[in-house]
């Protein structure tokens, strides 16, 4: 502001470098996420505009039908849905390609249509979901459609004793010498309307022959095992493959069920050796590695940010949702929730309880950990594994440990942080309402509020995100 009372150009910084928003991470890898933020302002205003309730959202914008709002469904599904449809379309359009998949749930009509279009060149190990009675089948309708279309279906009924919880796909070409794997797709996404659109999920596509061959070998073991964990399958699972080259990075590939919780030990070791910080998004994690992660946060002063749909461990009291100090309002970890009532111009989003009653039981369904993303050896853990004892010792699962790939780590870091930030605010509002506090009481016109940049949690946050600042 000049002496004349008008605005004038003053000192300014240089423009930041141009960035391109893309799923491509280089080295044949692309990372994909959906926009399943149902408890959000965007969806609250969408529902208000359409005159629908949270209970009606699933039928009108998620499940495929003649009346479904496909634009809303496409928005919620993001590049995750686009990529899953595209990989099936590529196989359907090329008679030389085949698709081999191991799936826990299959009920989304659009995805089932994609497999049906491939016909006999699609091979699927299909679980029976999470039934409570032996012999029941949550995927019965999809199984019938696939079989009628000539898809080669291998039944794998582990429930209710365990879950055949994989969601991986191997893409490859049929040659004179047999099936040649070329690509692998894995992640947290179940092939259901909620998996695509109303849960937060992720997927990773790797054009990588060695990894594709390893997942194909697992597919064959699962297909041959039927409804049990064969000795051959267990022996193979007990031999994780480490150090698979990926450009200048490496990948460790794990499958479960396995013996002795060696996968949990590996995850505990990873977070124990974190040097700067850890971000995570989880669905019903167990005690470990989360308990160790929280201990390391205190011992090493790590920057830790995370969201889980539900903390189920007996150590749940260790999860601090909100810090009491006004300057330390950041959550270390938060259970996903919505805005319970209108705050200013905010629209009512509904609550986590309403979500579970009308949409589904998973709000954040991703299973990912990012360790030291700005360090010399960033680590990403991603797959179907829920970081629990059941995932280790009972279920069919898979996960990758990607070491030293900065671009992949950045993709997962940004997604984890945006998820955390989204639910951090909602948890803060919920806490304020529960304690009858004004959520905006800490706002100040006094410039002294900036002093927090040099102390406490804000200082730790800035040093993590801007280590060169």
Residue ranges and their predicted role:
Residues 79-89, 258-266:
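A short, well-structured juxtamembrane/interface segment
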Residues 239-306, 313:
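Beta-propeller domains
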